[in-house]
A protein has these predicted regions:
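Conserved catalytic core of nucleotide polymerization and phosphodiester-bond processing enzymes
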Residues: 1-132
Length: 132
């Protein structure tokens, strides 16, 4: 097949090939070029990245979907994203109500068979946060 898919169907292709025995400085090539250069006994390179690509790519899919859902439902635009975190800025009087909705939207961004719990913290700045 030559690719893996994330939870939302994005593909990461693994279509570079090289000789069975790796050589320092080797540049993997597309299949036809690899066969021409090294003969018919070539192997697909970088497949060790495939498993992690599914996990990390699916996490990115979930985060992107959550960001869009949060914006569409609340109008909140995240100030910053860090890996699997959304940093949002809200007026003091609306924080708790907005937080409950943001958490719900993040947990339900993509329906899964297992729960996806979220943690939340509130603070005046990133150095002064308390768990909620």
């Amino acid at each position: 097949r030559g690719y893996v898919k994330t939870i939302l169907g994005r593909r990461r292709r693994f279509n570079l090939w090289g000789p069975r025995k790796y050589e320092v400085g080797l540049r993997p090539l597309p299949y036809d070029e690899a066969v021409e250069k090294w003969g018919k006994y070539v192997v697909r390179y970088f497949t060790y990245r495939a498993g992690n690509s599914v996990i990390q790519g699916s996490a990115a899919d979930m985060m992107k979907r959550a960001m869009v859902d949060v914006y569409m439902a609340t109008g909140i635009v995240p100030a910053l994203t860090i890996h699997d975190e959304l940093i949002i800025s809200r007026p003091p009087g609306t924080i708790r109500a907005d937080l409950a909705e943001v958490r719900r939207l993040m947990e339900e961004a993509i329906p899964l068979l297992v729960p996806v719990p979220t943690d939340a913290e509130i603070g005046t700045d990133l150095g002064n946060m308390e768990k909620v």
